[in-house]
UniProtKB/Swiss-Prot annotation:
Principal subcellular localisation of the protein: membrane
Glycosylation sites: 120, 254
Lineage: superkingdom: Eukaryota
Subcellular location field: Postsynaptic cell membrane; Cell membrane
Name listed for the protein in its UniProt record: Gamma-aminobutyric acid receptor subunit rho-2
Membrane protein topology class: Multi-pass membrane protein
């Protein structure tokens, strides 16, 4: 009996437990059914998630390794280049360089950047994509300074076409070296070159070429320089060899400049010519006016020195002679010779006066001597020389006593030279004429100096112009 009681009690408890759990299961199931979305709602929720999710990029930049060039291991990738010169900013003779602003464009094909497109339209990007893909490593050979413009943003444009063709453009200002020859300065023409080359890839990996030949280089018609006339722009290309790395394709932008001469005519040639002509004025000044002729000669010499110094200060120090140096130094020699010419005239005048003074002391008595004629070298007399009184013109007729002294001096000189005729008559005549007429050197200089300077100018401009 106790066993039967225990079994009945156990069954009763079990049934009570089952019955007590049935309502709770229904409430839980009902709550789940009311909060459970329908099948249609789940489908709409998935569509929303697809629409608002992150779109997959068309270029698939993350799927490729762009540290390697396109078609790595195959033939060299061709990279076309064209350039549009925006401005030629400056030419420096002292630093031997030039500054140019240009648009540099590269063209190549990278199949890794191909994307599907029904309209075959390209996609344009700014400079941020350049850091994620492969671009040609072109640099400027012999450049001193260069930079990419960044106002208001980096002036870089990347355009990708559906078939993988890429256009890469940037705006650059570069200062590059230009080897100049100043042997004809300022009547010279200079040819400068801007050279482009791949830094790392040899001609076996990258073939750099002008995309459209000479048409690949375009210039702005408004480009002008203050001191130069731009004559010609043209392109060339060749291979450059480095002993440690190999052969590289190199592109050249060549341009020829011809210097404007008018500025230097006003600043250099015209002042130098005026100084030479001013030095000739001393030939028309009386040789007895020592202060006037000396001061004029010194002034012209110093002015020429200033002109030469000013020209050299604005030019590089070269080890050869330039055309302007020839003109300035020849002009300086003409000015200096005009000073030496007066030194010779003054010296000969002093010697003549000393000789006359000695002869005056030798023949002190001139009483009753009223000759109106003087004796020449051959023993004859000349009335004109008597009036000239040993080289003085007729307009300067002296008092009677001094005139008689001059006549005696003149006769004494004639007698001395006549006695030495055997040593050379012609030499004595020329020496006597120069000593008696020291102003004759000025007369000859008035013709000789301008004539030689004109001949020099004709030769100079015919050779260098």
């Amino acid at each position: 009996m106790p066993y039967f009681m225990r079994l009945a009690l156990f069954l009763f408890c079990l049934m009570a437990l089952v019955e007590s759990r049935k309502p709770r299961r229904k409430r839980w199931t009902g709550h789940l059914e009311t909060s459970k979305p329908s099948h249609l709602y789940k489908k709409n929720l998935d569509v929303t998630k697809i629409r608002t999710g992150k779109p997959r990029p068309l270029l698939r930049v993350e799927d490729h390794d762009f540290t390697m060039r396109p078609a790595f291991g195959g033939p060299a990738i061709p990279v076309g280049v064209d350039v549009q010169v925006e401005s030629l900013d400056s030419i420096s003779e002292v630093d031997m360089d030039f500054t140019m602003t240009l648009y540099l464009r590269h063209y190549w094909r990278d199949e890794r950047l191909a994307f599907p497109s029904s309209s075959n339209r390209s996609m344009t990007f700014d400079g941020r994509l350049v850091k994620k893909i492969w671009v040609p490593d072109v640099f400027f050979v012999h450049s001193k300074r260069s930079f990419t413009h960044d106002t208001t943003t980096d002036n870089i444009m990347l355009r990708v076409f559906p078939d993988g063709h890429v256009l890469y453009s940037m705006r650059i200002t570069v200062t590059a070296m230009c080897n100049m020859d100043f042997s004809h300065f300022p009547l010279d023409s200079q040819t400068c070159s801007l050279e482009l080359e791949s830094y790392a890839y040899t001609d076996e990996d990258l073939m750099l070429y002008w995309k459209n030949g000479d048409e690949s280089l375009k210039t702005d018609e408004k480009i002008s320089l203050s001191q130069f006339l731009i004559q010609k722009f043209h392109t060339t290309s060749r291979l450059a060899f480095y002993s440690s790395t190999g052969w590289y394709n190199r592109l050249y932008i060549n341009f020829t400049l011809r210097r404007h001469i008018f500025f230097f005519l006003l600043q250099t040639y015209f002042p130098a010519t005026l100084m030479v002509m001013l030095s000739w004025v001393s030939f028309w000044i009386d040789h007895r006016a020592v202060p006037a002729r000396v001061s004029l000669g010194i002034m012209t010499v110093l002015t020429m020195s200033t002109i030469i110094t000013g020209v050299n200060a604005s030019m590089p120090r070269v080890s050869y002679i330039r055309a302007v140096d020839i003109y300035l130094w020849v002009s300086f020699v003409f000015v200096f010779l005009s000073v030496l010419e007066y030194a010779a005239v003054n010296y000969l005048t002093t010697v003549q006066e000393q000789k006359e003074r000695k002869l005056r002391d030798k023949f002190p008595c001139t009483c009753g001597m009223l000759h109106s004629r003087t004796m020449t070298l051959d023993g004859s007399y000349s009335e004109s020389e008597a009036n000239s009184l040993a080289g003085y013109p007729r307009s300067h007729i002296l008092p009677e006593e001094e005139r008689q002294d001059k006549i005696v001096v003149h006769l004494a000189l004639n007698s001395e030279l006549t006695s030495s005729r055997k040593k050379g008559l012609l030499k004595g005549q020329m020496g006597l004429y120069i000593f008696q007429n020291t102003h004759a050197i000025d007369k000859y200089s008035r013709l000789i100096f301008p004539a030689f300077y004109i001949v020099f100018n004709l030769i100079y401009w015919s050779v260098f112009s």
